[in-house]
Amino acid sequence: MELDICSLGNYWLENEKKFSIPKKRGMIKMSELNNRKMTGFASIDKPWLKYYELNADEMAKEVAKNKTIWDVIEESLIKYKDITAIEYFKKEISRPDFIDSVYLWARALRGMGVEEDEVVPIYGTFFPDVFSITCALNLIGATPYFLKLAMSKKDFEIETSESRFAIVFDGMWNNVKDVFSDDRFKKVIIITAADSMLSPKKEIVTFFNYIDGIKNKSLVPRKDKYIWVDTAKKMSDYYTGQVKVPFKENRNAFITSSSGTSLKGGVKGVIATNESAIAQLYQANNAGINYFVGDKCLTNFPPTASTSLNCLFLLPIYRGMTLINDPRVSESGFYKQMMENKPNVALTTGSLWEAFFRNIEKEIAKGKNVDLSYAKMWIIGGEGTNPAYFKKWNELMEMCGSKTPLYSGYGMSEVFSVLSVETLNSSNDARKIESPVISVGIPYPGTNVKIVDRLGNELRYGERGELLIKSSTAMKGYYNKPELTSKALSDGWVHTGDIFSVNEDGMLFLWGRADDKVILPNNEEMYLFDIANKIKSDKDVADAFVNAMPLVDGQISLVAHIVFNPEFIGNREEKYKEE
């Protein structure tokens, strides 16, 4: 059975009156699922399913047969052809124009000599041409590898050792020039921020970027192997053959970069297939997340991790939304982006949300009315979020007219982005729970989880251990790292390396990293995040983290880094000395 995912996306709004849940977006709460006897083990009970439509778990497991990710995206682009695909600094790119751009880039890449199953590294952030190139590579059966932005020269060389072509943002050229000047690269496409801008902004930005490049000695050399976007597109004239390749099962679709926390082993490229990437779309639709046709999504983070690639590009464009593409990332810039563009969907880090709501408070203090009624799916990664701050931010959203809360979630590249996120119903229940850490939502339908101890035994509700995930979105493996792959994947379960607990409602709580600990003299383990959470429970503390500093005699010293609230009055140095 194949599903019309786009239609499912609006199912809940169209049928909302049938379900006695007035004025609520999201999935219906199927409390009758609780009538069965609970075993005490989450992987068996799957208590989170009560927050979803009755058949959501099975529907989310359906697969798209013989389709690539570009196939399903193109179908959606055609279906919602009248909705703008991308807004980039006031320039609007229509869905038909986006499709044309993808096919043009597909011919250009073929004209350069990019072959089927070839891996093409991409270093930089999202721009309109990067969206098109990503889809074009999928169309021709090649694989984009979104490189981690912070890597050593050695890691760059290892991760790109099998590649003949690369794509680089000129603003980051200095970071990679030693690697991408290597003779093995046949062509390196240079992307600039000005490529898709309207005149005269395009010319102005190009001029100032050139001046900055001279000052910083970061200009890309003028050599035949380095080609700019306009020149690269002309390569399409040299290819007149078929660009679309036949579907191949389990073909590499994307390689994203792991955050590096899931397993030891340095830089890791995480391989997603067409099947696993499409499975994420199925799961998101059956989770009832608030990505609605015609709405806007702020796309500001680079596609290095699958969370950005999926949640800020593939999913919104597939669901008929408009991408607001602004690649500038800063605390002050994020607030401006949000206020000017009014995106319905936004996903960013805790520090950026903190800066955003701090600005909201300042505006309210000045007597200004702040309108956040357009918010529908604003998401924060839950790790390390101070529960007191999270509560305050949600109160601010409600005060400013938002009908939905700030949602928390959890994801990793090894499951191609999202594992869990709050729904409207589950978030209402989660807000009633007192805990040193916030809930990061409930698992997506079609996903199973379990919490295990060091021996791999599943733990009961409320007990803490490593989170394991089983999902059709799971990675194929780490790029050219079979030994690490075998450690991360065990009998279909993905090891996260993160300490979690799950309650009887199926809500997940992320405590911290499994290796964020010290061994006490009595051989007991102490998690450093527990100490930090204890400090953060103080009303005078905004944030805290604790690390272990090695001493010369082989012992360690624990050091707490504390950020006090601006309102705190007292001796900050003395406050925690005796404790």
Predicted regions and their residues:
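Conserved ATP-dependent adenylate/AMP-binding module captured primarily in the ANL superfamily
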Residues: 149-181, 197, 280-298, 330-344
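Conserved ATP/PPi-binding loop(s) of AMP-dependent carboxylate-activating enzymes
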Residues: 425-428, 436-446, 457-487, 507, ...
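N-lobe entry segment of adenylate-forming
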Residues: 2-93, 97-112, 195-220, 242-246, ...
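Conserved AMP-binding/adenylation subdomain of ANL enzymes
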Residues: 141, 278-296, 304-347, 354-366
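Conserved AMP-binding A3 loop
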Residues: 94-96, 244-246, 253-279
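AMP-binding/adenylate-forming catalytic core of the ANL superfamily
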Residues: 471, 476-477, 499-579
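Gly/Ser/Thr-rich phosphate-binding loop
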Residues: 188, 203-207, 219, 227, ...
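Conserved AMP-binding/adenylate-forming
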Residues: 88-92, 106-151, 300-302
